[in-house]
Every structure is written in C-alpha cells, then in structure tokens.
C-alpha cells in the first residue's frame, strides 16, 4: 500500500503529518510526504540552476525547501526516521530533481520501511493530481484548507482515497463516521476505517443513507458486514 501525505506549511501541517504518519505506521505502508511550493518563474529557474543539480550546489533554496526541512526535523524528533549521522540537519545534498522538476530525498524509516520527502512547485491541485496519477497512491492525506473550495477540488480531482485532517486535536476523544452502502468502494472504506480506528484507539459510527426501499436492504447488509469486520478486528463500533 502507498500513502501520500500532503503538507503546506510549518504552521498548519503538524497535525496532518502526525495523523498521516501514525496511519502509515499501522498500515505498514510505503509513504511519501509532499510539499507543493509556489511556482518558480523561468527567471528563477535559471537563477538557481535547477535542472539536474544537487541541492548543495544551488545558490538559493527553491520555494518549499524550508517546509521539507521542518518535516525532516519533525520525523527525526518523533522517531519516524533513523538518524543518519551525528548531524540532524536536513540532507539537502541528497535531494535530487528529475526532468519534471520533482525533487526527492529517500529516508531510512523506523516506523515504515519506505519513506521519502518530495518537493513539487506549481498549482497545488494539479501537482498533487499528477503525483497521484504518476506514482499510483492508494491513499492521500491532506489538511483541511481554510478555502473550502480547495478541499472540495482535491477530493473531486485526485484519483485516490482521500483522508482529510481538519483541526485535529490530540486531547479530544474523536469518533470515525463511516458511511457505507453497496458500492464497490465500501470494502476499502471499511478497511481504512478499521486501520485508522486501530491507529488512534477510537470508536467508529457506521451510517447508511437510503434513497429507496431497495437501497435500504442492500445498505443494511453493508452495515451489518462492516459491523462484523469491526468486531473481528477488536474495534468498538455503533450503527
């Protein structure tokens, strides 16, 4: 399984990263953390000699590198990665760019086996969509945006399951609201619901929305199956 965690800033992405990495730990998933920095003009591209160079040779950091530095420090502090040397600085010299402008550094994870930080620049929705399409992620974890239209667009246009972390607070006792029906995606939603509940030790509320009597019967069966799965996995659930 492959997870993509999208972060945007040091100020607002800590809960997204925390929730995402704890989910990744439980799922034992290959995980990529991405920041989409502001678009780089052609003038700036020439200025910092971006094409096919190592970060240590750049005169100027490209937009977004500071966010990756923060994410690296967070991962190290919370023991999600192993310290490579006596230095705990972000290894800019290992951040290498490909022809499309996507820069990546591979890390040795202690919580998950395959972990990397990547940087893309441009329109956030387009870049995330391109990343998901090119590398076939199963789950994308994003923060709740102050612009509701942006979160809506991400859910609509990104071709993977979406988990939105909105104003997460560790001191609050949350529940998962799991909507099920007879659609093909329900089994995957139930599986993710179980894993997230296990990651945070929280309850699940299972709901269905019936359009007519026929859907009522099918959805009731889906709800019963979801409840059985929760019990089997030791997750407390209500319907």
Where are these regions (language model features)?
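Structural beta-alpha unit
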Residues: 58, 73-140, 232-239
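Small/aliphatic-rich secondary-structure junction motif
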Residues: 1-66, 76, 83, 175-239
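Short hydrophobic/aromatic-rich motifs at helix boundaries and adjacent loops
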Residues: 40-45, 96-101, 162-165, 197-198
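Generic detector of short, locally flexible boundary/turn motifs and exposed helical patches
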Residues: 48-50, 81-82, 103-108, 128-130, ...
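Gly/Ser-rich helix-loop-strand patches that form or flank binding pockets
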Residues: 11-19, 24-26, 117-171
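Short secondary-structure capping/turn micro-motifs that flank functional sites
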Residues: 40-41, 91-92, 148, 171, ...
